[in-house]
Structure formats: structure tokens, C-alpha cells
Design a protein with these regions (language model features):
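Bacterial N-terminal signal peptides
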Residues: 5-15
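M14 metallocarboxypeptidase catalytic domain recognition
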Residues: 18-447
Length: 447
């Protein structure tokens, strides 16, 4: 059973104070107390949102209609033929209809039998405290390789923890080695992405003596950040049940909660495929980088010019996405576009996912990968992990999905680590992967 207290946001009252400290991770991850202060329960407004949320199927035959739906606040999680699906509140359904989009069905999610909870069926998933304990254990087992530090704090004061793997630099010390960053859980309900990041960290540390892995670890500066949105992910599992929460935990002026962190980055912020309605799941926030979580990612990446590759794990749909998301136009630099396509197509052969430019689904502005590429020239990908559909488990696919999803996605991760020195060589590099057994893909049964 989970024993850590789960953090809930206090929405009521004229004054809000969130300035409590969470013990920061030091550069070596040594003996840190990850206890979280106990806070008040959420307001009835947020509880009502949980109860009212529905799984909506609407007609979206083309990119333009899907973009229009996203701008109406609809967080599209699945596309099948000319239909788009996702979780929504009744007011979002009304906004879709007002925009001229046909809504075919709306199923109350609270009645779905697929819902599980961390304390029982999904106890193998890691909450915030358990993830921190796992990272501390990795540091203790390999102190000359692994270190941890906080890239910043969440809205409610939790440390956003990074594990660093580098044989010659610890903590925040600079490094000349080619760097790569893996990030997960921008969206609260995407817990499987946290597990993917944790298992990747564990695999690299535990296999550090193998020649192929040792070669990567000795020549790269690797950062793994398992949870960009710790406040939201902790709320999503509060009360021994899932809440289908997507955003962070900032209280908005209308008593709704949260900003979509993957619409809050600064490149073409809040243009296409994002909403300025605070109650919408795709709410872009009050300004670019208004949220401490996205601001922390910005500061972290800007301070490390050696990072050449970024992979952001999301769920679900089994997709490999690359810029641009905000526009239908492709990347203008021909060599870079060729490298992106080569990397995406090579990784798709490894995990069986579908590779494509992000905007092929629908245009969405203000996301991580667009900003990282535009502002810093970092080759950036989004993986929408398994499963493929809500009907296969959606955001809450159960414990068996952890191992199968990691098995499918280890080789792509190692492939990217290997290319971090020069992604432009991808078209000629083939699909050689260091440190991964040559195994067939085993299929598993939202950006």
C-alpha cells in the first residue's frame, strides 16, 4: 500500500499560500526525506469535475476539425478514421457543438469498469515518494555514475527530480559530453510514462558493466526526469481512485484547477490547438512559461547547451511525433528534417509505433518539442506510449503494461542515446543499438 500522504490543492478562501518547502535533492541523492506536507481537500468544484467527466466520441474527419476541437478545449487522446475521442466536461461538449462539431456519444467515465487505483490493482506503479526512493537507491548503488538534483519546484513546492548519469560529472556540474534528456508525466494521468522513465534509469544503472552500456555511459551526459507534474499526478491517485486529471494544480480565478503544461511552452504559445478557457483541458495558462514546472524545464535546458536530443514520454496511442506541432508546414532545414524522419522511422521499426509530424493529427501550439527545437535546436520527440486505445486500458492500462511497454521502447531510447553526439548522422547510421538485445517487437494489448 502507498503510505505517503497525497497532496491536494486548496481552492476555497480569499488567500492562497503555497510556499512550503519540500526537501530538495542534493547532487548525490543522499538520505533525503520525501515526506509531503498534508493539505486540505479539494473544493467541491474540482470534485464535481471528476464526477462529470465523460469519454466523448466526436466527428473529426480532418486536421482542421480536430484543431478546432482542441481550441474548444477538447483534449484529443485517440483518433480512429474520421472520429476523435477524449475525456471532456459537459461544458466542453457544448463548446464542441457550438463550434459545429458533431458529438456522437458521451460515456460517463466514473461508471467505466477499467478504472483502477494505485493502492490495490496498480500498486506496482510509483507515486512521488516511491519514485524518489527508487532514484536514491540507484544513486547509492552507483555513486560514481548516478546523481540526483532538482531542476526546480512544482506549483505546490515539490521538487522536480532529475537523475543524471555521467561518469565524470555529478549533480549540476557542467559537462562537455553530448547530452540527452528523457522527460515524463507532463500530464498528470499519464502514469505509465513515469514508469518508462524509471525503468530506463534502472536498466542503465543495473547494466552499467555491460560493454555496450558502459560505452554509452562513458561518452554521454544522460538526464532522466520521471515526473514533470508531480502535483497533478499525486492528485490523480488521491482517494484510492483515478480522477482523469490532465493539468497541473494551479488554482484558476474561476475556481477551476490547472494549466496544460504541454500547451504552456513559449513557441507560438496559445495559438492553434490550445484554449484560453481555464476550465479546458488544453488551457494554455496566463502567459508563456507561466507555470513553475515549464519554467523549470526551460531553465534546465537553457543551462545545458550540450543536450542535443530530448524525448518526452506521454500516453497513449502508440505514436512517435516530431516538430512541428503548431503548423502543417514541415521543418524548413532539409538536413534536419531528413534526420528527424530517419530517427522516427527507425524507432518505429523497433517499437511498432506510427511515426509522423505532430501536426498530422491536429495542430497544437506551445508544446515541449516545438519550443525545444525552435529555441535551442534540440532534436525533440514525443512518444505516445501504449496502449493504442481507451478500450485497451487508456491512461490506466494496468500493471502488465509496464513491462511490455518498456520492452518495446528500450531499444529506441538506447538508439537516441547513441545518436546524441550528432543526430544529423541518423540517415546514414542505420538502426544499430548499443546495449539492447536484438528482440522482436511484442505488441501491447494523448499529446
Amino acid at each position: 500500500m502507498r503510505t505517503a500522504e497525497l497532496l491536494i490543492v486548496l481552492l476555497c478562501g480569499p488567500t492562497l499560500s503555497w510556499a512550503f518547502p519540500d526537501p530538495a535533492f542534493d547532487s548525490r541523492g543522499a538520505s533525503l526525506d520525501l515526506g509531503v506536507p498534508k493539505m486540505a481537500s479539494p473544493s467541491t468544484d474540482l470534485a464535481a469535475e471528476v464526477a462529470d467527466r465523460l469519454w466523448v466520441t466526436a466527428v473529426g474527419p480532418d486536421r482542421e476539425s480536430r484543431t478546432l476541437a482542441s481550441e474548444a478545449g477538447f483534449a484529443i487522446e485517440e483518433i480512429r478514421g474520421n472520429r476523435m475521442m477524449g475525456a471532456a466536461l459537459p461544458e466542453t461538449i457544448a463548446a464542441l457543438k457550438q463550434a459545429g462539431i458533431e458529438v456522437e456519444s458521451a460515456v460517463p467515465l466514473q461508471r467505466r469498469a477499467t478504472a483502477k487505483d494505485f493502492p490495490s490493482e496498480d500498486a506496482s506503479f510509483h507515486n512521488y515518494a516511491e519514485a524518489g526512493a527508487l532514484l536514491r537507491g540507484l544513486v547509492a548503488s552507483a555513486p560514481r555514475l548516478a546523481s540526483t538534483f532538482s531542476i526546480g519546484r512544482s506549483f505546490l513546492g515539490r521538487d522536480i527530480i532529475a537523475l543524471r548519469l555521467n561518469t565524470s560529472a555529478q549533480g549540476t556540474a557542467p559537462s562537455a559530453k553530448p547530452g540527452i534528456a528523457f522527460m515524463a508525466t507532463h500530464h498528470a494521468r499519464e502514469h505509465l510514462s513515469t514508469e518508462m522513465a524509471l525503468l530506463l534509469a534502472q536498466h542503465l544503472v543495473e547494466n552499467r558493466a555491460k560493454p555496450e552500456i558502459a560505452a554509452l555511459l562513458g561518452s554521454r551526459d544522460i538526464y532522466i526526469i520521471p515526473n514533470i507534474n508531480p502535483d497533478g499526478s499525486e492528485y490523480d491517485i488521491e482517494g484510492d481512485r483515478y480522477h482523469m486529471h490532465r493539468k497541473n494544480m494551479r488554482p484558476n480565478g474561476d475556481k477551476s484547477v490547472g494549466v496544460d503544461l504541454n500547451r504552456n511552452y513559449g513557441h507560438h504559445w496559445c495559438e492553434t490547438g490550445a484554449s484560453d478557457n481555464p476550465r479546458a483541458d488544453t488551457y494554455c495558462g496566463s502567459a508563456p512559461f507561466s507555470e513553475p514546472e515549464t519554467g523549470s524545464v526551460k531553465t534546465f535546458l537553457e543551462a545545458r547547451p550540450n543536450i542535443k536530443v530530448l524525448l518526452a514520454y506521454h500516453t497513449f496511442s502508440e505514436l512517435i511525433l516530431y516538430p512541428w506541432g503548431y503548423t502543417d508546414a514541415p521543418i524548413s532545414e532539409a538536413p534536419a528534417l531528413a534526420a528527424y524522419k530517419a530517427m522516427a522511422e527507425t524507432m518505429a521499426k523497433m517499437n511498432g509505433y506510427t511515426p509522423q509530424q505532430s501536426s498530422e493529427l491536429y495542430t497544437a501550439s506551445g508544446d515541449t518539442t516545438d519550443w525545444a527545437w525552435a529555441a535551442l535546436g534540440i532534436y525533440s520527440f514525443t512518444f505516445e506510449l501504449s496502449p493504442k486505445s481507451l478500450w485497451d486500458g487508456g491512461f490506466y492500462p494496468g500493471v502488465p503494461a509496464i513491462a511490455t511497454t518498456f520492452a518495446a521502447n528500450l531499444r529506441p531510447a538506447l538508439y537516441l542515446i547513441g545518436l546524441a553526439d550528432d543526430p544529423l548522422r541518423a540517415p546514414a547510421a542505420g538502426d544499430a543499438v548499443a546495449g539492447a538485445e536484438d528482440r522482436p517487437f511484442h505488441a501491447n494489448s494523448g499529446r
